[in-house]
């Protein structure tokens, strides 16, 4: 980038990066006289692909296609002393994809403490699944949590089913309502007619 420490990646119209090679000793202006190189990706096509932008100062490994010095490309990015690895021996059971702005997908593989966290800093909006922990890795709960400091909305055009009935190992159909229907029938059969202040009876639950 022409701006040292730029917050965002600097790409050309083809999505290539400016790269300064270690053996280039020319005292060129920041961001200029560097090579425009493609970044190799695990998934790529004309209308689809995968991209996690690299920002200024990222160390990369440059290789040459078929050993041709005229066909270099970025093979991968590396952590270094200025950009340390965020998965180390302290949290080696975690799988993490995190952006510079701390948008995050984290998957914990420690047995009996498995969890997934999908989060963004905006409004501290998060989806937490499984063994729920805080930033100190202390247990907060278990199950799932969808939370935000902003507004929330739930919409389901064909219906919304909320139940506290157990469904062991998620083996039954998603909308299995037999147990819930039985409870509603039982409550209706056991309830005496309830009257309002006008002396009229409320109808039983349907």
Spans of model-derived segments:
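Structural signature for extended repeat/solenoid scaffolds and their inter-repeat hinge/linker regions
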Residues: 1-206
């Amino acid at each position: 980038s022409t701006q040292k420490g730029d917050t965002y990646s600097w790409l050309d119209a083809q999505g290539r990066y400016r790269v300064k090679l270690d053996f280039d000793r020319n005292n060129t202006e920041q961001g200029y006289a560097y090579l425009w190189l493609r970044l190799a990706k695990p998934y790529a096509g004309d209308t689809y692909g995968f991209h996690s932008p690299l920002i200024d100062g990222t160390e990369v490994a440059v290789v040459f296609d078929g050993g041709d010095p005229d066909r270099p490309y970025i093979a991968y990015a590396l952590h270094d002393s200025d950009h340390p690895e965020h998965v180390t021996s302290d949290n080696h059971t975690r799988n993490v994809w995190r952006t510079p702005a701390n948008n995050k997908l984290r998957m914990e593989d420690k047995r009996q403490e498995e969890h997934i966290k999908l989060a963004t800093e905006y409004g501290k909006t998060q989806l937490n699944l499984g063994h729920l922990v805080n930033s100190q890795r202390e247990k907060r709960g278990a199950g799932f949590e969808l939370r935000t400091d902003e507004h929330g909305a739930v919409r389901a055009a064909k219906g919304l089913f909320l139940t506290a009935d157990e469904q062991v190992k998620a083996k039954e159909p998603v909308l299995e309502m037999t147990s819930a229907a039985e409870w509603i029938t039982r409550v209706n059969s056991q309830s005496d007619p309830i009257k309002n202040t006008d002396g009229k009876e409320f109808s039983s639950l349907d």
